[in-house]
Amino acid sequence: MFQRKRSVSFGGYGWIDKTMLASLKMKKQELLSSADVTLPERPLSPPLTAPPTMKSAEFFEMLEKMQAPKLEDQKAGSQKHKEDYIPYPSIDEILEKGSPYPLVILPQFGGYWIEDPENLGTPTSSDSSVCEEEEENFSPSPYGYKLECKGEARAYRKHFLGKDHLNFYCTASSLGNLILSIKCEEVDGTEYLRIILRSKVKTLHERIPLAGFSKLPSIPQIAKAFCDDASGLKFNPVLYPKASQMIVAYDEHEVNNTFKFGVIYQKFRQTQEEELFGNNEESAAFRNFLNLLGDTITLQDFKGFRGGLDVSHGQTGVESVYTVFRDREIMFHVSTKLPFTEGDTQQLQRKRHIGNDIVAIIFQEENTPFVPDMIASNFLHAYIVVQVENPDADTTSYKVSVTAREDVPSFGPPLPSPPVFQKSPEFREFLLTKLINAENACCKSDKFAKLEDRTRAALLDNLHDELHGHTQTMLGLGPEEDKLENGGHGGFLESFKRAIRVRSHSMETMVGSQRKQHGGGIPGSLSGGIAHNSGEVTKTTFSPPVSAATAKNQSRSPIKRRSGLFPRLHTGLESQVDSRARCDSISGPQKTPDVGHSSQEMKSETSSNPSSPEICPNKDRPFVKLKENGRSNISRSSSSTSSFSSTAGESETLEEYDSVGSQPSTASPFKQDVFIYSASPGSDSPSVGAAATPVIMSRSPTDIKNRNSPRSNLKFRFDKLSHGSSSTSH
């Protein structure tokens, strides 16, 4: 007898064998004991019922093995990183050693350089990206200290403006938009070619001699000589009288004639940012130093360069220090003159202005070291530390040290050895020149250079577009005649516009050819055709006999046609009789227009559905006689719905046709069909005479006679053609 094996239920509802229970206990004990065994002795793949302690232990050991190489690399990297900066002691270690202290010490993790004749870490002059050029428009220094500025920024004003020269622009090159200025000049009997090439990366200014050239080089050759990537470019001349003013404005956008510098007062053994900004009292030595820098002015209603200070409501203090140095305005943000806020340890009102400066002066009244990273700021890149010596004596001197971030190039004038200055106008000249050159050099650091590159590229593109637009206007060309050069393209929108223009031109060409072939119109069998006017109108000629039901129809009053999207359907015997009577009413001869008969003619309301029209019940096969190029006996309905229209005469039909043609034409997107019914001469019934068979004629959806209809018009014509037997009956 088959016996079902008992199953183990973990829910507690099934029977459990004693033998199975014992085996489970043994396995559990083995697994628990295996947790104390070393990793190599453990099973490679623990069972699913392994205890959590075993699984978690193996999991964390596996993670440690996987992360071991990364941790070793990180440790090695951190050791190398620390080894690079081990020689730089902290400020606390310097203070423990006792005086004399250096003016500046490098941060523990580096990132700054110190300009000092004895310091080997000072960058050489070759690392500087600025050039020294004394400008003619500024007053010279009596002590020979030169202001460092970019010579390319003022070269156009100095050498090109107001003199004969040519300007060219290049569109959409591999280097972006380019603008080139060229000028011939002669110095000491030697001809030179002075060139300025502007790109989104930088501006190049060179002067090359023409002694070895038999003829002047072309503009693409000059651009190729400046940059190897500038090959195969096409330059266009700038034809605009005011182009020089626009170009000089672009070149001098980097020139700055207003500066603002911070001045921070550091007392003895102050090593924290909060301590520096918390000083409110000014010593006599500090006031004398401020008087050396400039004049103390009242901010209220101040008319000069305010440097971001409030000159209307006094929210940034009452006084400040201001000076004009070599035609440049300088405003100093003095920490002790900015508003002090009680309870604010960070003194954000003071740090808000000084922290946004690029260069700051640290004035030390006593011998105390300064660390550049002592002040947390993203903008401060250079510090000039000034320490006063013998402040109360007549021979007061100042010891100077300069520090800046590593990505800031060196700037002049260089410090003398030893870097000590007597209190004199020369020291003021040196200090102000050093401050201005320091800010110009800081603009070449990585952070500020990226901002400057984006600004330069945007301004260059704007200048190029303006010069191109003014040149096209001077030539009398519009935007449609603009052509992109050097493989440039206008993006998806311009490509789409060009495709649409090409398609429109091809459609117009097709329409013109169709008009020539078909006498000015496209056949109605072509669906989706172009709107056109056709002089040939297809009409049905008929000569119906006079029926006995005409008198009955004339006695009825005319029925007004009902317009609508779904016409009313006539059902029942009465509608059939009326329809038969209307069919008989048109059987009389209508060769000449009859006004009286037209006034009594009934224009029946439509009595059919477009899918199942109601027609006269005739069984014989009809025939249709078409007459071309004629307007007689035409019946048209101007209603937008499917309707029956009886023909009263030629004058009425022509008037109705003209009214339809004079209506505003709106193209219908649907193909329109016209159903024409004609009667055959063979008839079994004397009253009706012939059966009606539909003839479908397709018309263009843009036909001028149907363009006022929002949908397809079904026009039914009931024609009877007389024959010999019917004419003898009259």
From Swiss-Prot:
Biased amino acid composition, Polar residues: 535-557, 597-612, 699-712
Location in or out of the cell: Cytoplasm
Keyword Glycosyltransferase in record: no
A GO BP entry: regulation of small GTPase mediated signal transduction
Coiled-coil parts of chain: none
Molecular function (Gene Ontology), one example: GTPase activator activity
Pfam family, one: Rap-GAP_dimer
Residue stretches of biased makeup (Low complexity): 631-651
Domain Rap-GAP: 247-463
CC terms in the record's Gene Ontology section: cytoplasm; plasma membrane
Protein's job: GTPase activator for the nuclear Ras-related regulatory protein RAP-1A (KREV-1), converting it to the putatively inactive GDP-bound state.
Protein name: Rap1 GTPase-activating protein 2
Native source organism of the sequence: Gallus gallus
Source organism phylogeny: Eukaryota, Metazoa, Chordata, Craniata, Vertebrata
